[in-house]
Amino acid sequence: MHQITDDMAKNIILYLVLICFGMQGYAKGKSEFMESKHIPLVYDKENTAECYPQIKMRSFEELPSIPELPDPFAWADGSGRSTDFKDWERHRSEIMQMLYHYEIGEKPAVKKEQMKAGIVDDTLYVDITVGGETLRLTAGITYPEGEGPFPAIIGIGFGTGSLPKDIFDKRGVAQIAFRFQQVMSHTQKRGQEPINRLYPDQTEMGAYCAWPWGISRIIDALEIVGEASRIDMKHIAVSGCSFAGKMALFAGALDERIALTIAQEPGGGGVNSWRVSETLGNVETLGRTNYAWFKESMRRFSNCVDRLPIDHHELAALIAPRALLVLGNPDYEWFAERSNYESSKAAREVWSAFGIADRMGYSIEGGHPHCQLPLSQYPEVEAFVDKFLLGKKNIDTNVTKAIIETQE
């Protein structure tokens, strides 16, 4: 059994990781890709990395100890590393495959011919038929005044998630409420959830595989109904808070049609590094998380997180080169904001390597209740919305604010 010892914990310190992969990648990537206009802000496909071959997955017994944060630029077969942007989709493929295999289960692919969609009285619906079974998902849309097409935010539970509605109202952003219970309940009874009607054999699937699948089907529905949706498909955001903040993060990581992800106070299992959290106090570690959200088999890593071949700075980095804003709240010990801070800094090095660090930001600030955005964080959210949903130029989104730094 491998455990994170005090000496190993010291090796996790982010600065060593930055020396290992971040700064090398930045030096090379900045010179090659300074013109960020060559790097897409969003894609028109759910997963552009699906063309890459399957990598060999090691058994639990074969996995080596990796006490430091894994290098997102290293190839899974050990053949070296590359920080070239042209190789990033292959890196994404390898990281996603490991995420599916070790943590959440594989997100099912759906063909357009398996879906029918429509919009009635500002309610979007999509019927997904697999193996003779049909599952219907619905999402209410709140439109601004005008004809559109409008930029849109998909909020978990509510149209803007837990973010203040006025931020989006005054900017003319449509608001789409994702009803996650239509896919899988918060507590999940394995094999008995709505999604299992379509995929009865996928009983190991975690909720953070199922819920992003549902969000992707809502985006499919918008594509299918076309102009009738009145949504600008190049400017879609997703947001949620707490467990829904994790949901938004996974959704953004696994669907490249999402231009902006705002993960609000996601805590353990979100941006937080499993490895760093293991060195902290009463926080949500891999062994103490909610296993309705993940594969049961991930429990094997509870006392040996150093053998997990990936970590969640890489989950966050799956969103690159698209935009990500991470919001944290250090007033709650369980959220392990030290882990969020270290992992966010490490993830941001991927964007930095491509010369687009302004597309990833983090703001960790206390003095407010959970899931209630304080006025002091409004500017960060508004800047990311203005730049990546409204397409405004000359907006400063170089956001790296964390009161964690003053609590050393």
Regions found by a protein language model. Give the residues of each.
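Primarily recognizes the serine-hydrolase "nucleophile elbow" in alpha/beta-hydrolase
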Residues: 217-279
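Sec-dependent signal peptide recognition
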Residues: 9-15
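Cap/lid segment of the alpha/beta-hydrolase catalytic domain
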Residues: 155-228, 267-276
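Loop/turn elements at helix/coil->beta-strand transitions in domains of secreted/extracellular proteins
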Residues: 149-153, 170-175, 233-235, 256-260, ...
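Mobile cap/lid helix-loop segments that gate and shape the active-site cleft of serine hydrolases
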Residues: 227, 264-315, 336-344, 352-357
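Hydrophobic h-region of N-terminal signal peptides that target proteins for export
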Residues: 17-25
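Alpha/beta-hydrolase-fold serine-hydrolase catalytic core, especially in secreted/extracellular enzymes
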Residues: 30-138, 143-148, 256, 320-408
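N-terminal secretory signal peptides that target proteins for export/translocation
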Residues: 1-9
